[in-house]
Amino acid sequence: MDKKFARIRRATRARRKLQELGATRLVVHRTPRHIYAQVIAPNGSEVLVAASTVEKAIAEQLKYTGNKDAAAAVGKAVAERALEKGIKDVSFDRSGFQYHGRVQALADAAREAGLQF
């Protein structure tokens, strides 16, 4: 089992549990160059809010899009957009990634901006 397959198995297990709860999810995906965050409806088929370092508005403020500062900017942006739509409570879906570094920075920034999880 390689590293990517193990991560996908962890993510699948966590998503199954969150689906049983029927919770709105804050999903994080990261690549070496970018980080993406989406708030997904409980049914799992609708993206309610999204933000990423690919967006010009966020990328222009940053020197580099693949670090913790960039992740914090995405976390703040996704939280502000979610609060505008009336979404306050979410479950954090880290997609099998360790809760460390950029994933943690995004989560902390989203909490500081007002999301609860």
Swiss-Prot record:
Domain of life the protein comes from: Bacteria
The record lists the membrane-crossing segments as: none
State the similarity comment.
Belongs to the universal ribosomal protein uL18 family.
Q: How does it assemble?
A: Part of the 50S ribosomal subunit; part of the 5S rRNA/L5/L18/L25 subcomplex. Contacts the 5S and 23S rRNAs.
- For the keyword RNA-binding, the answer is yes
Q: Which UniProt keywords apply?
A: Ribonucleoprotein, Ribosomal protein, RNA-binding, rRNA-binding
| BP GO annotations | translation
CDD domains for the chain:
Ribosomal_L18_L5e (cd00432)
The yes or no answer to whether the keyword Transmembrane helix is present is no
**What is the gene name?**
rplR
Q: Tell me the organism.
A: Shigella sonnei (strain Ss046)
The name of this protein is Large ribosomal subunit protein uL18
Q: Name one GO molecular function term.
A: 5S rRNA binding
One Gene Ontology term, aspect cellular component: cytosolic large ribosomal subunit
Q: What does this protein do?
A: This is one of the proteins that bind and probably mediate the attachment of the 5S RNA into the large ribosomal subunit, where it forms part of the central protuberance.
